[in-house]
Amino acid sequence: PILHLRMGAGPVKILMWSQMHGDESTATAALMDFIHLLCRQTEYNFNDWQTRFTIDIVPMLNADGAAKQTRVNGQFIDINRDALVLQSPEGRVLQHLVSSLQPDLALNLHDQNAYHGISERQHTSTIAMLAPVADHAKHITPVRKQAMQLICAAQKVLREYIPNHVARFDDTFSPRSFGDNIVSQGVSTILIESGTFINDPHRQVARKMNVLTYFTLLDALLHNKYEHYTIEDYFAIPEHQDDVYVDLKLTDLLIANTDHPFTIDITINVDKHGSTNIEHIGDCHTVKGFKELSLSGYQLISDYQDLQPDSAANLIFVSPSGLLITINELLST
């Protein structure tokens, strides 16, 4: 079933949904925290929120995908590419909510790739936000401008807790995606993408920052704490980049068993099944590893021809002390 929860009975209507992709659960946990704290009414000065806001929440839009930990639903459809044709029941439910509720603000909650970062600073993109566009020209409509201003208000607070880890998500127009489609229907929409933080594989920092973001947005709406922000302030937020991070970065490996010895770096990622894969070979100084190790003095025992991008990292090295070491052992050190 798709569960829909309503809180409050105020004039400002907010629609929030999470886990449109079944394997993206960070915001679902954050929504449970948010509901709990909002009902307690002790941590935040929101005693009159019930008369100011009507908050509609769908905590798990893609229950079938969540059960299987897959991005797609039970039909193998990516719900977030179904906004135009509405062939998925989940997509139809979401569109019905948008059409019937006509929210003042829609929050589209996702997880982002673990390797996204802020390239010029080589920091993880723990929270990335976006005011989606409604067309290829990326016109700044009144509802998009409001989303931009609200994002500015939220990121100002977030930077007090996770400086250098707040980013602006890519705004390429995607007409099949719900965020862009909902903006085109005249609804102010914010995409919130939860990412990683150093030594936080389960994204608990992003979970906490989501909750803080939700309350900050409510506070900004309640007390008009966003209207002074400009479009320039929004675009000053650093844009996140792909492939800034890898799981393991190995540097200074000398390839000596050749007519012309050379030194390389190797980057490796681990997929959700635990398999290790080679990403890059060569100069990798622009990429940062969640774990970084120098292999100066090590020797590669594996055939160098096995060392190819997009191949399994079934590599064996000899340490300076003569020990045989595998990639998995390097990951666990």
Across the structure, where does each feature detected by a protein language model lie?
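Residues at the C-termini of beta-strands that transition into short coil/loop
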Residues: G8, L61, E193
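A short loop-to-beta-strand scaffold at the N-terminal edge of the catalytic core in hydrolase folds
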Residues: P1-R6
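Active-site/substrate-binding loop(s) of hydrolase catalytic cores
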Residues: P11-L15, M20, S25-N164
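Feature targets compositionally biased, intrinsically disordered low-complexity regions
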Residues: M7-A9, S321
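C-terminal accessory segments enriched in acidic
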Residues: M129-T333
